[in-house]
Every structure is written in structure tokens, then in C-alpha cells.
Amino acid sequence: MGRGFTASEEQLKPDPRYDDKVLSRFINCLMKDGKKSVAQRVVYRAFDEIDKRLDGEEMTAIDVFRQAIENVKPNVEVRSKRVGGANYQVPMQVKPKRKQALAFRWILQAARSEKGKPMHMRLGRELMEASRNEGRAINTRDQTHRMAEANKAFAHFAW
């Protein structure tokens, strides 16, 4: 096991516009090839799109973002466990950090899968839908929950 450097929670700087560490981590997840400024531009433009759509409502883009992340977070997932030569899909609780990571991944995956529009528009739309409990990321979460529900019989194998 390596004893190398690991980035800690405290070292993550909040993003410059909204002063939010969760958003900063989301930007890092969106980033490709170390191009952080491009990722920031995409997220901030997506937030501008959201603000345009909200128009008269009292919610802000950052509120929509937080609500979307909260809605997409899974509570349970299935993990493979080998017992006596057979692999079982065992439902398990998801740890808080993994919940957040999965939510980020699913939202970005949903936004990237829809082609034909600029990324900031796709991301803005996906965040809006997720905040209303709709969209592809929510479908992924529901599918994960259904899978866990279907394999409830193997819950006693949890470690």
C-alpha cells in the first residue's frame, strides 16, 4: 500500500464565484485533462441558464444545484459478494462521500450522453430536472434502488 500524498477535504478550495466546496468538487469532476477554467466556464454558464429559467422564483442556481445533488444521491446500492462459489448482489448502505460522488457522476453522465447541444445547456437542463426529481440521473438512482430492493433477500450477506 502506497504512502503517497492524499488530497484531504480541507485542501479543497471553494469555487471563486459561489464560495462553495461542493460546487468546487463538482467542477473538478467535470474537468477533463486538467482544464479547470473550461470546466468552471461550463458550470457557470449552466448556472446562468438556470437563473434565466428560474426568472421569477425565489430559488437561485446554487439552490437548484444543491437540491439536484440531494435528490440524486442514492441510499442503497448492490455490491457483488462471492459466497460458496456463487456471486450474490448484496444491497448495502452507501457512505456519504460515495453518495455525493455517485450523484456527481450520474448527473455528468446524463448531461454528456445527450448530444447536439452545448454542454452548459445540457448540464443546466439536467440539474433543473434533477431538482424536480426528473431526468436521467434520477432514473439511474431509481434503478439502483430497485436493484437493491429486488436483492433484499441477500441482505444478510452484508459485511
Language model features with spans:
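Strongly charged
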Residues: G2-D33, S37, R45-W159
